[in-house]
Amino acid sequence: MTKKDKKEVKVQTVTTEDGETVKVFEDLQGFETFIANETEDDDFDHLHCKLNYYPPFVLHESHEDPEKISDAANSHSKKFVRHLHQHIEKHLLKDIKQAVRKPELKFHEKSKEETFDKITWHYGEETEYHGRPFKIDVQVVCTHEDAMVFVDYKTHPVGAN
């Protein structure tokens, strides 16, 4: 077993003001594994979890040391925003599609919202698994403060059966 395989999944369970319990992950691998496991357990249409992490391209540039991440890596940097958008489209969403066993998902509902403090991308798609229709909503936020990225993943059933 390699050192990477032994990596402990960093996760916290928090309770929102609405009384909902949400798992908050600190690494992409644990987040994707959780979604895949919940899909296997048929809990795919009532899921809410979050991911707060430094994207792999940021860690690569800092030689895997969060202390060495450039202060310029934030929502005010065009280069950071461009690379983050590529990471979301080519890696994060692709990995989510694989985790929910729906590689054909297209995330047709796309939007981007920019303010001085942050940039938010919204992705949504209705799909079906085991004959149960549900909607996936993914929100990705980066702020002007640092390179930390916040992902909010929610699924809910669609229509009354």
Curated annotation (Swiss-Prot):
Cross-link (Glycyl lysine isopeptide (Lys-Gly) (interchain with G-Cter in ubiquitin)): K68
Regulation: induction: Up-regulated by a wide range of conditions, such as intracellular iron depletion, carbon source restriction, high temperature, high osmotic stress, cold stress, unfolded protein response, and high hydrostatic pressure. The promoter contains several binding sites for the stress response transcription factors MSN2, MSN4 and HSF1. Down-regulated when treated with different antifungal drugs from the azole class.
An example Gene Ontology CC term for this record: nucleus
Lineage top rank: taxon: Eukaryota
Topology in the lipid bilayer: Peripheral membrane protein
Locations listed in the record: Cell membrane
An annotated GO BP: energy reserve metabolic process
Misc remark: Present with 8450 molecules/cell in log phase SD medium.
Function: Involved in the control of energetic metabolism and significantly contribute to cell fitness, especially under respiratory growth conditions.
Family: Belongs to the RGI1 family.
Listed name of the protein: Respiratory growth induced protein 1
Organism: Saccharomyces cerevisiae (strain ATCC 204508 / S288c) (Baker's yeast)
